[in-house]
């Protein structure tokens, strides 16, 4: 639980580990690995680079696997050092720049800087994503 006015050191350290584990899970190349980070409720929306939105975990899982991960021979998602954590009680928001390296099965390598915002809810002993938003800045910005 995030408590207002309390030292944030422990929470920031915990969320740093959580975000790094989240990136490691997506870097496995299968959408099954990061499943533990996502709430499975109906009606949740997750924004991605493409397509615009996924409605629920199943749609996110299947869409990212088919459109992105199945075409990759290697994926590496890395969170930047500038992690911001804010929240109160059972809800937290994380904001962090990320870097993605993707090597396609045809050998082409693509790298991009990304912006990431996650909305987390504490459920039992775990924090799970109830919304996230991944975006890429326009070229030249």
State each model region's role.
Residues 27, 98-104, 120:
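Beta-strand elements of well-folded, non-transmembrane domains
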Residues 54-55, 101-104, 137-141:
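A short local loop/turn or secondary-structure capping micro-motif enriched for an aromatic residue
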Residues 38, 98-100, 133-136:
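Short beta-strand segments enriched in hydrophobic/aromatic residues
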């Amino acid at each position: 639980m995030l408590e207002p006015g309390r030292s944030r050191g422990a929470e920031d350290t915990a969320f740093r580990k959580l975000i790094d584990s989240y990136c490691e899970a997506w870097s496995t190349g299968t959408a099954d690995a990061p499943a533990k980070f996502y709430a499975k409720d109906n009606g949740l929306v997750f924004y991605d680079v493409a397509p615009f939105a996924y409605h629920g975990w199943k749609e996110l899982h299947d869409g990212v696997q088919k459109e992105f991960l199945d075409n990759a021979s290697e994926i590496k998602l890395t969170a930047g050092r500038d992690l911001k954590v804010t929240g109160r009680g059972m809800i937290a928001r994380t904001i962090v720049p990320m870097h993605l390296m993707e090597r396609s099965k045809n050998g082409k390598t693509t790298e991009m800087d990304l912006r990431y915002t996650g909305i987390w809810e504490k459920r039992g002993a775990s924090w799970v994503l109830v919304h996230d938003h991944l975006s890429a800045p326009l070229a030249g910005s």
